[in-house]
């Protein structure tokens, strides 16, 4: 990151840079990477991550490219690693239209989710706030080391900004961090394997899709070839 050199963005695949597309004022808009057939990922030492202190864990997440998954409020930018947040929020119940069902797509990755939560707890001075569906708490009700809260009602009830305002309102100079549930899993997966996880679940849905479904792909993958495989009205 130009504004914070400690923050690294890593490639989701091994290969070579095919092109760099720039926009106004030479701003980088897109980096096209030609993927190689092998998965030559950098391996990090993670066997003792549970024994790391806050600063050591921050360095591990920064060096491995996992830090950009953590965002801060206000403004919704990448979290400043030099700050300690007032709280960290993870909402597993989204109410915006066509949002994926995290209880479904993360059903087989609950241990990685738990590990990700445990890591986030090291970065703040209080347990993570974990939002769950009031009518169907599902797999997330048994997550330990969190402050559970329930979400009900129509959109925008699932908007995490509303949850922050209710549970940890921001005063002048305060920062609250938020993490997407699937990115919590990616953090946990990294802490289990030592490798950056590029996996991303995409919902192919909408009125024009005859057979909506979830697709597991890689972060940054071009979506048009995937969409072309579906019958559209």
What are these regions (language model features)?
Residues 2-4, 9-19:
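Generic structural motif
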